[in-house]
């Protein structure tokens, strides 16, 4: 109830008390993990998710949740291993492909990122998939492909303003990965 009301700190205390009364119950551990993740305490959430995974190794949600906590901590190589595991566990798992694409991209593995974005674009792309594929194409030096993908991201997002908001959220990452800051206005105009 506390968790549903977004009172995560209080929920954590209640779950800890429950864990004392009935230790190592997977339901309690997963809820503790979720509350910590909601509070953006990814390190603690990760500990609980790993504990839950040890108890439920067949659970297909846990590799994604563990990978997400690792990615939030910028531990992209470890996160990639979790997402590859999920991709192995489930066939054509777009959720895993998106995570692999993004973690590959921010790790500078642009060709790998592009491979996964191409798989997504062939199935059920969102506007952000076109945007991220555009980023990968840009950093691979393929401006024509980047422009095409940014154009699709613009049309899929509904309007240019929405696209630019999404693009601007990634601006610092693009610069960090090697895009010249003075080229950003030109790149924004490609869409």
Segments from the language model and where they lie:
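Terminal, low-structured helical/coil segments at or just beyond the last alpha-helical repeat
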Residues: 159-191
